[in-house]
Amino acid sequence: MVSSWRVQQAAQNIRAGAVIAYPTEAVWGLGCDPWDEEAVYRLLAIKLRPVEKGLILIADNIRQFDFLFEDFPELWLDRMASTWPGPNTWLVPHQNLLPEWITGIHETVALRVTDHPTVRELCALVGPLISTSANPAGRPAARSRLRVEQYFRGQINGVLGGSLGGRRNPSVIRDIATGQVMRAG
């Protein structure tokens, strides 16, 4: 586990507009403050990802997403709560409560409550984070810090060290309304 002072330093950097890399359950991720438009667009440019595709928000607990859930049916809340924390991402209506640099062209946003201890600690300090796999578009996701550094040397503001969570595949993505799997995990 990464020492708390390193996580605190990463949190401070994120609050200052940094784009950082960090280990997740299966692959390395890139992240930043979702409310910092400049940081999000810098992340998208680094990754060569079109804004239209949208991004995932991760959190350390479901309460960090409460602002989105005001009119949600109990069934939806139960679906999410029964799979979190863990490698389950849900597509939920954003109800125009999030900017397009997060949602892209979609009427939904992808949400996940992580069970990776380092990322949970980071989210507990800064709130929800943008999270996307650490790879340029069209390249395999980084599974090592070395690969992150090869992909993004000089382009990101830091790397929060640590180990991957041991999963082989990224999270499953499901639609909250239908339960349909959009991406297998």
Curated annotation (Swiss-Prot):
Q: Which UniProt keywords apply?
A: ATP-binding, Cytoplasm, Nucleotide-binding, Nucleotidyltransferase, Transferase, tRNA processing
Q: Return the InterPro entries for the record.
A: DHBP_synth_RibB-like_a/b_dom, Sua5-like_dom, TC-AMP_synthase, TC-AMP_synthase_SUA5
Q: Name the reaction it catalyses.
A: L-threonine + hydrogencarbonate + ATP = L-threonylcarbamoyladenylate + diphosphate + H2O
Q: What's an example GO cellular component term for this entry?
A: cytoplasm
Q: Which Pfam families match?
A: Sua5_yciO_yrdC (PF01300)
**EC id:** 2.7.7.87
Which family does the similarity line name?
Answer: Belongs to the SUA5 family. TsaC subfamily.
**Free-text function comment from the UniProt entry:** Required for the formation of a threonylcarbamoyl group on adenosine at position 37 (t(6)A37) in tRNAs that read codons beginning with adenine. Catalyzes the conversion of L-threonine, HCO(3)(-)/CO(2) and ATP to give threonylcarbamoyl-AMP (TC-AMP) as the acyladenylate intermediate, with the release of diphosphate.
Q: What is this protein called?
A: Threonylcarbamoyl-AMP synthase
This chain's source organism reads Pseudomonas syringae pv. tomato (strain ATCC BAA-871 / DC3000)
